[in-house]
């Protein structure tokens, strides 16, 4: 599979969160030496190649061509054909060319007068006749992040490297561009935005957690440009000796295999949940940088998970073992329940409009709508012909569900009530679709990543059938996460409504 334009995971950042002028990293010589030494040490541990690189040399043909071009022209000898270019005296007289050198410059007298009206400006900004901005000015404006800008962070797998791309999206100005990127050490599989700052002053930040093909979770600061290492990491790589033993169980240090999905607890901000190919879910205490709990309910790779939007203790996860698990994280071993399905679980998501309900998608193309208090699904939807890798409810429009699949299609559904209906279907021309996400501030704006064509943003409200189905539907905006709660599958401490119309 060609990896030249693959986007494997995507996440949005709300308007007004990012720093207006991001900081730029300036490394000292000592820091550069330290980073180089650490990189060499990692390469040696992983059995990297030699440090020697082949250097190219100019070819003989190229050198010969350069010599030919640099050789001076030889003077013409008598009798050469080019001597015919010399004009005789009669021709000079006919055109008065023999007196050409005697004539004065007609513009010489008026040159000084013409300069009298010339105005010189210190810069193009001061010149009223220069209306086009220079490139540097455009770059300065693009570097600033406005309060109305959303950020979109996606993991990209290039042919020879992997990185995070940070895009700026502004619907009002119709702008969408790459702001900066971050070089990654491993293939990215999941991204999750969070604002928890591990510093003691309990401030908020603008961070992105990245799960990859290694057991280590990297957390990067999105307000810093040109950073070469994450702010902090969770977990550690296994040594070669431990790998040879073939142990699959999770240790106190963290996962032992790739991290497939991440979910941040918005109510208890120092908690991050991770799903891994080692069959476990780990709850991380980011203030300590260590696992707080390890959940080993599944018997195969855990591919997806999500915290409840209003209940800090409630978590769901989906696995290759064709099951979904619901946990009460206060006592996960004792308080959990399971649902079994026909296929491997690809995605799970809570319905933030109906907090007792959640959705699950499978690798055989089905979507299930479930009540956490019941064993039977509310409805089963045969949505696609292949695995469903994107499962996203609109951030503000009740009943609007968007699914993305390996069958290359994105489909928009109205799931209000017990009978879902297809509103629109589109081949995105992106090959296999890997991920999707709805903008938290704009309910009809979705981002998609796939096998090719990079990151794509689609305003689904431009489709007439979408406008007919959802255009007049009431928008419900989520209230503050700190003040909002609602009765859910494990009860709640508050009766405040989580929605504001």
Swiss-Prot record:
Can you quote a single GO CC term?
Answer: chromosome
For this UniProt entry, what is the primary localization, expressed as one broad class?
nucleus
Please list the residue ranges that the record marks as compositionally biased, kind Acidic residues. 77-89
Recite the UniProt keywords alphabetically. Chromosome, Nucleus, Phosphoprotein, Repeat, Ribosome biogenesis, Transcription, Transcription regulation, WD repeat
* Localization: Nucleus; Nucleus, Nucleolus; Chromosome
Q: How does it assemble?
A: Associates with the RNA polymerase (Pol I) complex. Interacts with POLR1E.
Question: What is the protein's name according to its record?
Answer: Periodic tryptophan protein 1 homolog
Q: Which organism is it from?
A: Homo sapiens (Human)
């Amino acid at each position: 599979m060609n990896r030249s334009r693959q986007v494997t995971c995507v996440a949005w950042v709300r308007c007004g969160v990012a720093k207006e002028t991001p900081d730029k990293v300036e490394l000292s010589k000592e820091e550069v030496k330290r980073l180089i030494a650490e990189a060499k040490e990692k390469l040696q541990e992983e059995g990297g190649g030699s440090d020697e690189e082949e250097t190219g040399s100019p070819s003989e043909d190229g050198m010969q061509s350069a010599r030919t071009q640099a050789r001076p022209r030889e003077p013409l000898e008598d009798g050469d054909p080019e001597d015919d270019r010399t004009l005789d005296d009669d021709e000079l007289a006919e055109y008065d060319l023999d007196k050409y050198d005697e004539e004065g410059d007609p513009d010489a007298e008026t040159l000084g007068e013409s300069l009298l009206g010339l105005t010189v400006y210190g810069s193009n900004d001061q010149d009223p006749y220069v209306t086009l901005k220079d490139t540097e000015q455009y770059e300065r404006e693009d570097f600033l992040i406005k309060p109305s800008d959303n950020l979109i962070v996606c993991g990209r797998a290039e042919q020879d490297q992997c990185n995070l791309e940070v895009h700026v999206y502004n619907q009002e100005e119709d702008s969408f561009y790459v702001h900066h990127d971050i070089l990654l050490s491993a293939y990215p599989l999941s991204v999750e935005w969070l604002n928890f700052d591990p510093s003691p002053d309990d401030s908020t930040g603008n961070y992105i957690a990245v799960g990859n093909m290694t057991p280590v979770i990297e957390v990067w600061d999105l307000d810093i440009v040109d950073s070469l290492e994450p702010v902090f990491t969770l977990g550690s790589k296994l040594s070669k000796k431990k790998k040879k033993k073939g142990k699959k169980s999770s240790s106190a240090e963290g996962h032992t295999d790739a991290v497939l999905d991440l979910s941040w607890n918005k109510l208890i901000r120092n908690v991050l949940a991770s799903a891994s190919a080692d069959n476990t879910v780990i709850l991380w205490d980011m203030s300590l940088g260590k696992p707080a709990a390890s959940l080993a309910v599944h018997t195969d790779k855990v591919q997806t998970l999500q915290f409840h939007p209003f209940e800090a203790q409630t978590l769901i996860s989906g696995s290759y073992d064709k099951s979904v698990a619901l946990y009460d994280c206060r006592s996960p071993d004792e308080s959990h329940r399971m649902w079994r399905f026909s296929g491997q679980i690809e995605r799970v998501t809570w319905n933030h409009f109906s907090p007792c309900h959640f959705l699950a998608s499978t690798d055989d193309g089905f979507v299930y709508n479930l009540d956490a208090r019941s064993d039977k699904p509310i409805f089963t939807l045969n949505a696609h012909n292949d695995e469903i890798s994107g499962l996203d409810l609109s951030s503000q429009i009740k009943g609007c569900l968007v699914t993305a699949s390996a069958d290359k299609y994105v489909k928009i559904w109205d799931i209000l009530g017990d009978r879902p209906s297809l509103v629109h279907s589109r081949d995105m021309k992106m090959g296999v679709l890997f991920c999707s996400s709805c903008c938290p501030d704009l309910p009809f704006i979705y981002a998609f990543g796939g096998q090719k064509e990079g990151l794509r943003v689609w305003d689904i409200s431009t489709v007439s059938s979408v406008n007919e189905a959802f255009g007049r539907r009431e928008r419900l905006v989520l209230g503050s996460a700190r003040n909002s709660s609602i009765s859910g599958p494990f009860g709640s401490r508050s009766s405040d409504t989580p929605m504001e119309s």
